[in-house]
Amino acid sequence: MEILDLTQTLINFPYPGDPELRIIEKKIDGFIVSEIIMGSHLCTHIDYPKHVGLENRIPFKDGIIKGKGYCISLDDFERNKLPACDILLIYTGFSKYWGRDEYFEKIPEIPFLDDIIKSNIKCVGIDACTIGGFEEHKRLLSNNILIIENLNENLKNLVGKSFYFLGLPLKIFDIDASPIRCIAIL
């Protein structure tokens, strides 16, 4: 069994205009306690329907994102050939720009969103800062398909493979997004 971590390390690299990461150490009764302040879309995160003004409906028990995963490459995807899976991951190669300004300048175009919406996919993830603009988000989220953004470069090792996917967001349900820890088990 092999486990691949698909999560970006939590660093102060917010989308332009989003809240920055701040960690404030406090000493309380001899202990160090850190106060962590950050936006809900910092680094690897999951978007919920509330992100686009919809009521949150989460298609996974207890909010744990798990199931059969499959990864495709944006470059060589053949239209109408979506694999049968619960979680579809899309490798764009944009993750190689992580930590640099150009990462936010590269917005992928996903020409097969209609195919994803017509499928039984419950969650789609990508190694880019976004899966698209407001309309793309709303189309997916209104069809009860959750979105994971900012996956790391390990995604390239999964292209063309099936695996078991496990994503653990914070256990907060009435929120627009949450940081999430994502792994693939091969």
From Swiss-Prot:
GO terms for biological process: L-tryptophan catabolic process to kynurenine. GO terms for molecular function: arylformamidase activity. Disulfide bonds: none annotated. Coiled coil: none annotated. This is Uncharacterized protein MJ0783.
